Amino acid sequence: MATTMTRVSVGVVLFVLLVSLVAVSAARSGPDDVIKLPSQASRFFRPAENDDDSNSGTRWAVLVAGSSGYWNYRHQADICHAYQLLRKGGLKEENIVVFMYDDIANNYENPRPGTIINSPHGKDVYQGVPKDYTGDDVNVDNLFAVILGDKTAVKGGSGKVVDSGPNDHIFIFYSDHGGPGVLGMPTSPYLYANDLNDVLKKKHALGTYKSLVFYLEACESGSIFEGLLPEGLNIYATTASNAEESSWGTYCPGEEPSPPPEYETCLGDLYSVAWMEDSGMHNLQTETLHQQYELVKRRTAPVGYSYGSHVMQYGDVGISKDNLDLYMGTNPANDNFTFADANSLKPPSRVTNQRDADLVHFWEKYRKAPEGSARKTEAQKQVLEAMSHRLHIDNSVILVGKILFGISRGPEVLNKVRSAGQPLVDDWNCLKNQVRAFERHCGSLSQYGIKHMRSFANICNAGIQMEQMEEAASQACTTLPTGPWSSLNRGFSA
């Protein structure tokens, strides 16, 4: 009897810990809960591509899944789906570069070994995807070398790069976790916004593309380009969220539509499946980037629902007059399906905050596992470790702020949001150094902890010196965490 009561108690505790963090209720809400989309002035400064040689260049694509772990299934599913879409559109394999850790399809947790799906009734999208850069070869240095077409700088992998010319069109799709000013990677360090924008500027200076389109799925993804991506580079970027909000996982357990019952993880991301499911059903010679942007924006923050994020656009917005086929090609099977200014794909009834999708997986795994099984014990451990890590990081950052700025002023300084159009931080090297100082004493931020990047940026913007940060971090964290979250094991985020 005592054992039974203990198991029930553990289950109740885990459920209480998770209930406020996992899938967001998406029953239709009242007017006060509706997300109001910001009005955006049209900045169509660039004429549409109507010249005779607009289609004479080669189409290139770079697809990046920036995470690892079965609980992050959806990111690699997004990338594999995008690859299949581009191949059906006519892009050659030699012109598509794929980055993915490749630990999902044959993972022991995968109920359909050797396959990956991106929607509840979707077909396998894994078969045929080239393994250009996998495992530890999925890193910032290789990504930058690939974008710049620098074969000599690539280490490992297939060696494939974007060997583009002045008339070529490039499409980049990145799906992962993010935080203010940073994108995750399955390796260390993470990808920082200033470095990415510097590489895009170098690519423009090389004169090796005509136009470049960047689709970005991540939390706070607007912060990657806001105040950093100038006009005049012939680059158009859209992001799943603005600079200060989460993006959303979809096709998760308990949602409608739900994944097949044997799956215990989210299959896709809301922004990503929105643009891909739209592209997969239309003749892309009849649909512009701007039309897709508007459609994806409506599906990602549907009117009358309490969930969603604000899809944003940056850079040379005039490029959005281009037809999608200039970057993605078009599937001949869709020739008769021209774009209609309405979304036939209904928004899901519920979605899951990107940062909580791992908890959804751990809870589903725990809930379904037989009592007394090794699987249930493993899931219980994963939930408790994840929750403990979150509490440690949150409390440590808050305490650092109070030590540096005082008990009452600390939270105010850490949470300050700069006005629209400004970059996250003035000194990016300062940001990286402050992050390293924190991680030396408090452990790895991880995919969850990068939500606090704005706090570290504000510490820099307030003029705090490295010595002060080192002292504050050492006071906040008297012992370095061990186990999976130690910076000794994971390396540094910066």
UniProtKB/Swiss-Prot annotation:
Cytoplasm is among the record's keywords = no
Q: Where does the record locate the signal sequence feature? A: 1-29
Q: Which cysteines are joined by disulfide bonds?
A: C252-C266, C430-C460, C442-C477
Cite a single GO BP annotation: response to ethylene
- Compartments it resides in: Vacuole; Lytic vacuole
The record ties this protein, via InterPro entries, to: AE (IPR043577), Legum_prodom (IPR048501), Legumain_prodom_sf (IPR046427), Peptidase_C13 (IPR001096)
* Residues under site feature: Required for post-translational maturation and enzyme activity: C266
- Say where the protein is mainly found: other
Q: Keyword annotations for this protein?
A: Disulfide bond, Glycoprotein, Hydrolase, Protease, Signal, Thiol protease, Vacuole
Which residues are glycosylated according to the annotation?
N336
List of catalytic residues: H177, C219
| Induction trigger | By senescence, wounding, jasmonic acid (JA), ethylene and salicylic acid (SA).
Can you list the GO cellular component terms from the UniProt entry?
Answer: lytic vacuole; protein storage vacuole
**Catalyzed reactions per annotation:** Hydrolysis of proteins and small molecule substrates at -Asn-|-Xaa- bonds
Knocked-out gene: effects: No macroscopic phenotype, probably due to functional redundancy. In plants lacking all vacuolar-processing enzyme isozymes (e.g. alpha, beta, gamma and delta) shift of storage protein accumulation from normally processed polypeptides to a finite number of prominent alternatively processed polypeptides cleaved at sites other than the conserved Asn residues targeted by VPE.
Note whether Disulfide bond occurs among the keywords: yes
Tissue spec: Specific to vegetative organs, especially in senescent tissues. Also expressed in seeds and root tips.
* An annotated Gene Ontology molecular function: cysteine-type endopeptidase activity
Which purpose does this protein serve, as stated in its record? Asparagine-specific endopeptidase involved in the processing of vacuolar seed protein precursors into the mature forms. Probably involved in post-translational proteolysis of seed storage proteins in the protein storage vacuole of developing seeds.
Family of the protein in this entry: Belongs to the peptidase C13 family.
Q: What is this protein called?
A: Vacuolar-processing enzyme gamma-isozyme
The organism that produces this protein has a lineage beginning with:
Eukaryota, Viridiplantae, Streptophyta, Embryophyta, Tracheophyta
